């Protein structure tokens, strides 16, 4: 019995990996024009795709030497939606090694430099996406975000990025880290374009992504974003400032942005959420066991019960991991060793405890 496959609807040439002046920021992983429908919401828009998201006929390296030689044989759902909406996919943007870095220095292909100042990083892990947008080489990009990987490069490089509500955008056909923290999100040079791209890629994916409910629909975000923010209530979380590892000039930049929102009509209030200081630790503890399962066994599918599994990518990863385990990034090895030790000593006790703690943490933000 043949397994279902994701559709590939639009023709494309083989493409190539650019070098030299054509890739002066190290942000391009692959160039290949794929023209979508003749009309649609994204007609005339040039889009790049983060290199942990499948585009049929193009290499998908996930920032790692381990994936060298793998060529995707399916289009991720977000890619199909972009093409159906008239967008033109220009190629793949470099991402960090296994998407597990907030910098832009870990990709096997080399560092991604910030077009604002090439001596600085773009932020990661959607590093190439931000660099190509800021350099004017594309209009939009689709990145992925588990712990800031859309938001940080957008902030560091000076473009717009959104981590959508969990499950709003289907993750189908993208390389995961852990299902509870995996998000695909739009990036663009303007808020309007970012909203327009979200409008196109959001919505239910015919049961392929089990995080979604059948009633999930996209909204006219490109219209809603033009309504302004008058009366919008925004909380500034006190525990997010002056924390260990934070920097004063960054705190001041956020405070300055908050004041500008007040001038635009928003209501900005200082709030306290004591559990915020522990939320990152709990998030890591709750996801590390699933991350081990992804990197040890499933690879480009991850534990995805009831959802779609890209079989070609899974087979390649499993064989590569057996024959070229040395190509696994150091951070992945560290996380896997940590998770193995935790399993051996404590089973899933602390992972389960962290899952239980997520509910009161969510409730604290909602109060």
Residue ranges, per PLM feature:
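Short, basic, glycine/proline-bearing loop/turn elements
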Residues: 61-65, 114-116, 343-353
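Extracellular/periplasmic catalytic domains that process cell-envelope and extracellular macromolecules
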Residues: 40-42, 83, 133, 228
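Enzymes and membrane/adaptor proteins characterized by extended Gly/Ser/Thr/Asp/Glu-rich
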Residues: 40-75
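Short glycine/serine-rich loop segments
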Residues: 75-76, 80-201
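Generic beta-strand/beta-sheet core signal
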Residues: 50, 92, 143, 237-239, ...
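Short, well-ordered beta-strand elements within core beta-sheets of diverse protein domains
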Residues: 28-30, 66-70, 182-189, 339-344
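Amidase signature
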Residues: 1-39, 200-367
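Conserved hydrophobic/aromatic pocket- or pore-lining residues that grip, position, or stack substrates
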Residues: 50, 82, 261
């Amino acid at each position: 019995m043949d397994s279902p496959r994701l559709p590939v609807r639009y023709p494309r040439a083989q493409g190539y990996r650019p070098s030299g002046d054509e890739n002066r920021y190290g942000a391009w992983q692959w160039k290949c024009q794929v023209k979508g429908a003749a009309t649609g919401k994204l007609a005339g828009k040039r889009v790049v795709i983060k290199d942990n998201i499948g585009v049929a006929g193009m290499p998908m390296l996930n920032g790692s030497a381990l994936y060298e030689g793998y060529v995707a044989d399916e289009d991720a759902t977000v890619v199909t939606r972009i093409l159906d909406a008239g967008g033109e996919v220009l190629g793949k943007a470099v991402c960090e090694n296994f998407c597990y870095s907030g910098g832009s220095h870990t990709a096997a292909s080399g560092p991604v430099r910030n077009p604002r100042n090439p001596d600085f990083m773009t932020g990661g892990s959607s590093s190439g996406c931000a660099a190509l947008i800021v350099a004017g080489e594309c209009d939009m990009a689709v990145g992925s975000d588990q712990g800031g990987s859309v938001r940080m490069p957008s902030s560091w490089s000076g473009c717009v990025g959104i981590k959508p509500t969990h499950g709003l955008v289907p993750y189908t056909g993208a390389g995961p880290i852990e299902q509870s923290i995996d998000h695909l999100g739009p990036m663009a040079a303007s808020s309007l374009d970012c909203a327009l791209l979200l409008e196109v890629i959001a919505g239910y994916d015919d049961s392929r992504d089990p995080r979604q409910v059948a009633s999930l629909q996209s909204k006219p975000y490109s219209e809603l974003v033009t309504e302004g923010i008058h009366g919008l209530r925004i909380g500034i979380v006190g525990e997010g400032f002056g924390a260990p590892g934070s920097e004063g000039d960054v705190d001041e930049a956020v405070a300055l942005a908050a004041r500008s929102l007040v001038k635009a009509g928003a209501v900005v209030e200082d709030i306290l959420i004591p559990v915020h200081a522990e939320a990152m630790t709990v998030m890591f503890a709750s996801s590390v066991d699933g991350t081990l399962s992804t990197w040890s066994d499933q690879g480009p599918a991850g534990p995805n019960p009831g959802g779609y599994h890209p079989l070609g990518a899974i087979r390649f990863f499993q064989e590569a991991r057996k024959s070229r385990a040395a190509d696994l990034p150091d951070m992945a090895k560290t996380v896997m060793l940590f998770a193995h030790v935790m399993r051996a000593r404590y089973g899933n006790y602390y992972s389960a405890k962290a899952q239980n703690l997520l509910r009161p943490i969510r409730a604290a933000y909602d109060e």
